[in-house]
Amino acid sequence: MMLEHVLVLSAYLFSIGIYGLITSRNMVRALMCLELILNAVNINFVTFSDFFDNRQLKGDIFSIFVIAIAAAEAAIGPAIVSSIYRNRKSTRINQSNLLNK
């Protein structure tokens, strides 16, 4: 694939993730959009590493770190959402002000 095609795909995924993160009212949807953003960043890291830096694997190593962060977010995020749901009976972002009781 050409560099431009991969970058357009990554920009498309990133834009969908940002739009979903800004407009979502549900915490689960916001977590999924955050995963889309992280995957778009991974695509960029691997693409630039492949096209411009064939011998060194800096982009690949960065993408492994981002995958590790995404895995931690995927493990901790739903646990936090389920805890909030048990206490508030809602996963809507605007109804989960935890500072007011």
UniProtKB/Swiss-Prot annotation:
Single GO BP term: photosynthesis, light reaction
First-level EC class: translocase
Record membrane topology: Multi-pass membrane protein
InterPro entries recorded: NADH_UbQ_OxRdtase_chain4L/K, NUOK/Mnh_C1-like
Function comment: NDH shuttles electrons from NAD(P)H:plastoquinone, via FMN and iron-sulfur (Fe-S) centers, to quinones in the photosynthetic chain and possibly in a chloroplast respiratory chain. The immediate electron acceptor for the enzyme in this species is believed to be plastoquinone. Couples the redox reaction to proton translocation, and thus conserves the redox energy in a proton gradient.
Family affiliation: Belongs to the complex I subunit 4L family.
Protein name as annotated: NAD(P)H-quinone oxidoreductase subunit 4L, chloroplastic
Species name: Vitis vinifera
